[in-house]
Amino acid sequence: MPYQIHRYPAELIDVISLTYGERVVVRPVLPQDRELMVAFFHGLSADARCNRFMHPVSEPSSELLRQFTQVDYTSHVALVAEVFLDGRETVIGEARYVRAADASLAEVSLSVAELWQGKGLAKLMLTKLERHATAAGVRRLFSETLATNQKVLSLAVKAGFVIAESADKDGVMRLEKTLGPRNHIHRCADCGFVVDDGAGRS
C-alpha cells in the first residue's frame, strides 16, 4: 500500500530549551528523514539499541526505517529532536505513539542520544506526545521495557506511569498511564495545536 499521510501536523514543530539552555528543534518526522534516522541509530550504543527494541539490533532494517519515517499521523504520531552540529542537521532523539486496535489505547516509545540524556529532552518530548494523544482521543498510554532499563523506568515514574511486571514476559516491565480528560485540551491560535489546562500533566 502506498504511503499516505493524513495531514502533516506542523503545529507540533517547536523550539525548546533544555536544562542547560541548549536549543533543540522538535518536529514531526518525514519520509526524507531516513538518512538522519540511520545516523541516529548508528550513534546509539549497543545497550541503548537493545533497550529501545528489547533485543539486540546492530543495523536498522529497511522495514524498520520505513516504519519510523513513513508516519500517517492518525494511528501513528512521531517526533524527532534535532540540532545543528558542525553545520549539519543531526537527530538527537525520537519519540512516538502508535494506536492499538482499541484506538483509545496507544503504545509510546522514545530514545535519546547518550550525550543528550539528563537534560530534560525525553520528558519534554513525552509531554508533547501526551498532550497530542489526549487531544486526539487517546485515553491510556502504555509501554514495555526491560527490567534493567533504569533510565526509562525512572523517567516513567517521574511522568506518572504505573509500573508493573509483565504478566507474560520474563524480565519485562509494563508501564501504563491514564491521560486527562480531552476537554482540558483546547486549540490556541497563538501558540499552536494544544494547550494543557492541567489535566494529565505529570
Residue ranges and their predicted role:
Residues M1-S202:
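Long, contiguous binding/interaction regions
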